[in-house]
UniProtKB/Swiss-Prot annotation:
One GO cellular component term: cytoplasm
The protein, known as: Chaperone protein DnaJ
Entry keywords, A to Z: Chaperone, Cytoplasm, DNA replication, Metal-binding, Repeat, Stress response, Zinc, Zinc-finger
Repeat region (CXXCXGXG motif), residues: 144-151, 161-168, 183-190, 197-204
Binding residues annotated for Zn(2+) 1, in chain numbering: 144, 147, 197, 200
Domain of life according to the entry: Bacteria
Organism per entry: Marinomonas sp. (strain MWYL1)
Gene: dnaJ
Entries under NCBIfam families matching the protein: DnaJ_bact (TIGR02349), PRK10767.1 (NF008035)
Amino acid sequence: MSKRDYYDVLGVAKDADKKDIKKAYRSLANKYHPDKNPDNPEALDKFKELAEAYEILSSDDKRAAYDRFGHDGVNGQAGGYGGAGAGGFSDIFGDVFGDIFGGGGGGQSRTRRGSDLRYTLELDLEQAVWGCEEKIRIPTLVNCKTCDGSGAKKGSTPKTCGTCGGAGQVRMSQGFFSVQQTCPECHGAGQVISDPCRDCHGQGRVQEYKTLNVKIPAGVDTGDRIRLSGEGEAGTHGGPAGDLFVQVSVKPHSIFERDGANLYCEVPISFTTAALGGEIDVPTLDGRVRLKVTAECQSGKLFRLRNKGVKPVRGGPVGDLICKVVVETPVNLTSRQKELFTELAESMGEGTDHSPKQKSWFDGVKRFFDDIKK
């Protein structure tokens, strides 16, 4: 009888990742588990098929061979139910279903790496652009100095677990299966502590606050992460420490907005400067510069100052500062100033020669109403 496609067996797409494959297998294998279907031989066959499919698709090498050559590429490599041996199906079953049946978990190592930590660091825009060094204080778990991380009272030592013989796991029979589970006595440590340390209560770790100096490279932006290896929580039973990930968050700036390597700002200019032109001071992150405003400048016009932006942290050219001019309408006018504006308005007449956008707008309105009348 020809075998079904392994992807169809698990009900996953051919580009499914390991997480989705494991999730699908776990759900279906739990459904067709022989212990739940003791009088259903079809369920047992289905369970065998699921186990075989998962063994192939959960292995990068076997999956690659299967994707290329189909079942011919993996013949003899799938152990299936009852054929995988000590390192085959029982390991798969323990990895996937350990928590359902009271423990499990593949791997024999008793050491455990410490957890990674994350710290969100708020920076001013200037700090992010130029780089800086910041001091942070984080809560973490460190090795207990009293017992040197052993968890045992000073002068005593942990003893080999009598239940698992130091392996950290025990083999349990459940129905048709012999599976490995985490030892219920030592919880996987392989050792038991009869006289625990008073400071860490046998855990081997205590909580402390740790102060670190973090060097922030120039050009970072919100969302960037800085990894500090070994600065996470201490491992257990001699395991390595985790890492600390510093997440950058740049605070809003009162003048500038950042988009990648470019900076943006609005620059207010007077009515007369917009009409006649002139030079104005524009702020940049490294000082003021003079910007020449052309005559008859309209509100919203953009001026680009080359290389006045940000040099990206991952390399590349320095960005630009893009200035958007905003023409301000004069306020708090004196009587004389109002007279002058009245004279100016009269000199311009009723036409729109001096207001090209206004003329374009009125032309558009006229076409709109002409179309309605048709």
